[in-house]
Swiss-Prot record:
Disulfide bonds: none
Protein name in UniProt: Phosphate acyltransferase
Domain of life according to the entry: Bacteria
SUPFAM superfamilies in UniProt: Isocitrate/Isopropylmalate dehydrogenase-like
The species this protein was found in: Clostridium botulinum (strain Loch Maree / Type A3)
The protein's assembly and partners: Homodimer. Probably interacts with PlsY.
One example GO MF annotation: phosphate:acyl-[acyl carrier protein] acyltransferase activity
């Protein structure tokens, strides 16, 4: 399997991108990586780490897409950018997956306009996997589509279901529709229409769920439009981050707190690890005609290594084909 990695995307590119790639080719068999970006910079990082293998190569790209550029314009105009070059490798069949920690909007545009959508899929969605109290959960969509139709949400749910079943090995994952109340009649026109459609599928649909229920692990797949999904995601990340800071401040404020903190250090360490995004790799763009993983902007080497592992599993489990097959089932049932 060949994986294209955007070598210039993210806060710590290309240093930690290269480090993550080296770790990945050492740990996972059957992968070859093409790092796109400024050749001299990437080669210097490989040389620093004394990498002498033949499982990593460089494809030169002189341009970089920044996070403050208009996503669609950047993808269309910067043909010599590291992100576009990586996407084109997948489009041309020279790689089977693409990974980038660069601009989310630009990668979304690239997944749609460079890779294209799977035939019959209306919209590509961003599907982050997040730690929950009982088990990880996925939000679909987490920001790619702020305006949606009910049928889009059904497709998002289907693709999330495929990911859980194929990649994570979870049989019959639960699907919940994010809403302001659990009752069927709650919500706006979109959620009411989506509820009716989801109820008629063969998904393990548990009905409406409120945002507070999501991190409790009440559902595997939380379905919503991108506006709601991104709000839920950012709130969740903010609360988790501030919770750790508040606990640390409280413990350091008194002698009793310091003693208690020392005694509970192993517990806090395990708890923090549970919320470590690097364990999950990245967020797939589901519905694209190619495996496309968005790594977190602040990804370290471990996160990149795990994103590469994630891409490999998606490829091995034939996730694109599985989405196509499941889409066919929806169409057969007129949903």
């Amino acid at each position: 399997m060949i994986i294209a990695v955007d070598g210039m995307g993210g806060d710590f590119a290309p240093e930690l991108v290269v480090e993550g790639c080296i770790q990945a080719v050492k740990e996972y068999e059957g992968i070859h990586i093409i790092i796109t970006g400024k050749k001299e910079l990437i080669k210097n990082e490989l040389d620093k780490r004394e990498y002498k293998g033949n499982k990593i190569e460089i494809l030169n790209a002189e341009e970089v897409i920044s996070t403050n550029e208009a996503p669609v314009k950047a993808i269309r105009r910067k043909k010599d950018s590291s992100m576009v070059k990586a996407l084109e490798l997948v489009k041309e069949g020279k790689a089977q997956a693409v990974i980038s920690a660069g601009s989310t909007g630009a990668l979304m545009a690239g997944a749609t306009f460079v890779l294209g959508r799977i035939k019959g899929i209306n919209r590509v969605c961003l599907a982050p996997l997040l730690p929950g109290a009982k088990a990880p959960f996925m939000i679909v969509d987490a920001g790619a589509n702020v305006d949606c139709k009910a049928e889009y949400l059904v497709q998002f749910a289907m693709m999330g279901k495929v990911y859980f079943e194929s990649v994570l090995g979870v049989k019959s994952p639960t699907v919940g529709l994010v809403n302001i109340g659990a009752e069927e009649e709650k919500g706006n026109e979109l959620t009411k229409a989506a509820y009716k459609l989801l109820k008629d599928t063969d998904f393990n649909f548990i009905g409406n769920i409120e945002p507070r229920d999501i991190p409790r692990g009440e559902v595997n797949i939380a379905v919503c439009d991108g506006f709601i999904g991104n709000t839920v995601l950012k709130t969740y990340e903010g609360v988790a981050s501030n919770l750790f800071s508040m606990l640390k401040d409280e413990m350091m404020a008194s002698t009793r707190g310091k003693i208690g903190g020392a005694l509970l250090k192993p517990v806090f360490k395990d708890f923090k690890k549970k919320f470590d995004y690097t364990e999950y790799g990245g967020s797939p763009f589901l519905g694209a005609k190619g495996i496309c993983i968005k790594a977190h902007g602040s990804s370290d080497a471990k996160a990149f290594k795990n994103a590469i592992r994630q891409a490999k599993i998606c490829y091995d489990k034939k996730i694109i084909e599985e989405i196509e097959n499941n889409l066919g089932n929806l169409i057969e049932n007129n949903i």
